[in-house]
Amino acid sequence: TEYKDFPLPRLVFGFSVSADNLITDVQLGVTETGRLTPKSKMFIYPFSNVEEFRLCTGSNVLPSIKSLHQLNGLPYFILKMPNNYDYYKEERTKLNLDYRGLLEHLKDKDSQYYYDNVLIDMEKTLNDFITEVSK
């Protein structure tokens, strides 16, 4: 099922790029709202295909890039990739729904709904996310 205009919490992305301009790793996280600082709170990613901060792209092939500014369009590309149940666990949200149930429940909510009713504190900070990306 394709969900058009699906609401999302605030996401941050990290990319590892090889010397030959291949994207070798993608990190994805959920931050708190407001001004971001190294101490900004991170939340458990509520959907599938992410473990800790690491995105599993499965058989999806990430594009090669010619310059770093091309990374700007990569979040859209990633969010359009097909999802499955890989790495999905019901206990990653306060709602404890199966994946299809979660998507159906969230499809008409706004982004703030995540912070009030869905997200669980990861007990990590944005600085932890940046450190993971830098490894």
Task: Label each PLM-derived region with a short phrase.
Residues 6-9, 16-18, 29-31, 46-50, ...:
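Generic signature of intrinsically disordered, low-complexity segments enriched in small/polar residues
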Residues 1-66:
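Compact alpha/beta protein-protein interaction domains typified by the UBC
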Residues 37-101:
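Glycine-centered motif in EGF-like
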Residues 91-135:
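Charge-rich (especially acidic), low-complexity segments
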